[in-house]
Amino acid sequence: MENLEKNTKKKIKKPNNFKKNNKDKTEELKDKPTPRMFKMTPKSSKFLHQLGVTGRKHTEKPVPLNDPDYEKKIREIQAKEAKKIRSDEVVNNNSKKQNNNKQAKKKANKNKKQKGNNNNFQNNKKPENWKQKPAANNQVKAIPNSEKSTAKTAINLIIKRTFETLKQNNLIAPNLKQNPNKKDKPQQPNVAAKNNNQKEVKKPYNNFVNNQKNHNKNNAGNKGDNKQPTKPLNQSKLSKSTIVELPFTPNFTSNQPKPTQKEDSKKVKAKKAENSQPQESNKQVKKLEVKTNQQKQDQTKKKQPKENKNQQIKAVNLNNNQQKTNNNNQKNSVDKSENDNNKKKSEANQKQENLNPNNNNKKKEDSKNESNNIPLINKNISDQQIVKISNYIKDNYPVIYADLKEKNRLGFNSNLDDDKLIVYANYEAKDLELLLKKFKVVTNNIGLYEEALTHNSYANEMHLKYNYQRLEFLGDAIINKIVAEYLFNHSDSSEGEMTKDRIKIIQSNTLIKAATQLELINYIRVGEGLKIAPLSPKILEDIFEAFIGAMYLDQGEYAVRKILNDTIIGYYQKGQLTENTDYKSIFQEIIHSTGLNMKIHYERTYDRQKNLHTVSLYAGGIMYGEGKDSSTHKAEIKAAKEAISKFRGLLKLEK
């Protein structure tokens, strides 16, 4: 039965009251963009240009990620969106804050009014120092009617009281005319000083400090009373030397009652009307009092330095007399010691002169030469001249070396090597970031540049697995490629002329010149043994090629073309390159001049372990020369050099 009752109870579902969809509204919404129904919380600013801050349709154009001013533009877009759309929560919070501020201002105004009413004298609560005020008011009433206009002001009372306190504390100079006969005795100078060089100087300011301390002690017990302050214990009159111009104005009105800061507005207006007339008269009174005090002080000052000078002169004369006696005793002792030493030296020199008369003549000649060379030492060379000389040598030495080699080319001297230029490495290599700042390069991998500027000796000492040889191989190939493309695109010459121009651009002298221009030798890391010894110029070529290889891997071919256009190709365009000895073409001329139709052939091999290319030169099946180098081009030149040296005695070329 229970189951049947359960089944009979039908579940009554409440009908869902769906809203009627108006067709007109749906048609209008088709044209409008559908708003986003979820709140956007962008975690990074990189997607703000696509999504927006509020989740609604973005009205601004999107900003590309590669734009250099990406961050600035996004900030501007965010500011515009913040002005257009503000969430309801922010508006409600701002309205609450405004209401709270208004209520706080009302409370503050009420408190101010209550405080103003409490300060009135009508209330029962009396402020501090209330008993002291009627004394001042009674004094004003006692003054006759003729002086009421000036005496009512509080300024006159303050001036009089300060003047009286200054007199009591002996801070104003006494009247010298009253006691002209009395003169203070000058203090006797301390003759028996510990050190003769010390000079005693008086410190008059200390007297003022002692008087002021005593004044403060006496005033401490009389805070509540209106009586005049008692005089200090040391009431002896100050001497002329103790009168001091104070660097500040002391406040002696500490015991007097302070006027209340807030008075009734009616009283203030009444006082202003009364004080407007007597202010001018008060100013005149002040000026007269100040002038009289200044005149008295000036008279005392004129007399003061005369006495001080006389006292100082006596002390100085005594000290000077003692110093002279001490100095004379010292001189006599020094002269005796010098005479004894000179006698000993003269005896020793006479013995040596008798033994070695030839050496003495040489010493005299050397001393004459040194005396003649002294004025040259005083002629100092400026730093600017040194910089000019060093730059001229760095830039022009490779060219000078090439010119000297050309003059000896036709004679076919035995000195056919290029290793004549002497180079020294720095004891400590410079920072690579300074080098890269010249080229305005932001590196993605500094390790490549470190590898390009590490020599074998440094790698062996530090147990490194890399050096610049691998990057040199890559850089040599890149330079050949870029130079060949430049000549092919910018010249209409034949194949043979282009090869000569390419050799001219890639020759060792141009690479040395480029390396010196970039100052790569300052950044190379070398072992301790090579820091002292001179380096071969071949290192400059290798460094330049390795640096080009590192730049190609890090920045690409475009950055390499910039450097080569500024250095190697730029020299070619300006006509700064000199024709180098083309040993390969000379060898061909020698073979053709014999009249024998011999074929010239180069055989090339490569050793990967040693990173060396070996080239052997054959003519008519006979090997005439062999060369080894890290690049094939340089190995071919060395093989041609060796071949020319064998024909040197057979042919006589015209000079």
From Swiss-Prot:
One GO cellular component, as annotated: cytoplasm
Main location, first listed in the record: cytoplasm
Region of interest called Disordered, as start-end residue ranges on this chain: 1-148, 171-376
The UniProt record lists the keyword Hydrolase: yes
RNase III domain: residues covered: 432-556
PANTHER family on file: DICER-RELATED, ENDORIBONUCLEASE DICER
NCBIfam families on file: RNaseIII
UniProt-recorded name of the protein: Ribonuclease 3
Native source species: Mycoplasmoides gallisepticum (strain R(low / passage 15 / clone 2)) (Mycoplasma gallisepticum)
Lineage, opening ranks: Bacteria, Bacillati, Mycoplasmatota, Mycoplasmoidales, Mycoplasmoidaceae
